[in-house]
Amino acid sequence: TINHRQEQYAVAQTDSLTHDINSVLKYKSQYIGDNSNTANLFYNLPLNNVSMKFQINSDDCSLTVNYLDTIWNIGEEKVQRDLVYNSAAAFSLIDNLTKITYEFSGKSYSFTRSQFENAFGTPLSSLLNQKVWSEKIQSKLDDTTFVEEFY
């Protein structure tokens, strides 16, 4: 049924290995300063089922995402994989975003655009096509060693 397919699609959007990058292309922006655009992007990426708050620093074009839960409660492997995915998506879609910090109760992680462009060997915006995204981003996230290089 249609409802069943919609439910399956919604569940797939909460996992970095099955997320549809096309679903967030409408949030592509040159600037980090648009609060509602940034919030809507993260509300449509993996970990969207965890309550979060945002803080944008327009001086250095950085973003802090404060997840209102613990890593232990969500699962460390899922958190690490999804944060790499969400960072790749955000750096790909927001042109002037330079750094993202993710805060959880008791722990935080920070990533930079250059760290991601070095890891993937290309400007991230060039990967914004579902086939290329699946090959270059999602397929690597299944490799724990690759994901751990970011931590």
Show the residue positions of the predicted features.
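N-proximal, solvent-exposed amphipathic alpha-helical segments enriched in charged/polar residues
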Residues: I2-S62, D69-I74, K140-Y151
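Polar/charged, Gly/Pro-rich intrinsically disordered segments
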Residues: T101-Y151
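A short interface-forming secondary-structure element
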Residues: V65-R81, F116
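Short, non-transmembrane amphipathic alpha-helical segments
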Residues: G75-L97
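Structural recognition of the beta-strand scaffold that forms the well-ordered cores
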Residues: T64-V65, T101
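Short, flexible coil/linker segments at or flanking structured domains
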Residues: R5, A12, K53, D82-A90, ...
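A short, structured loop/turn motif at beta-sheet edges
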Residues: N57-S62, S92-T98, G106
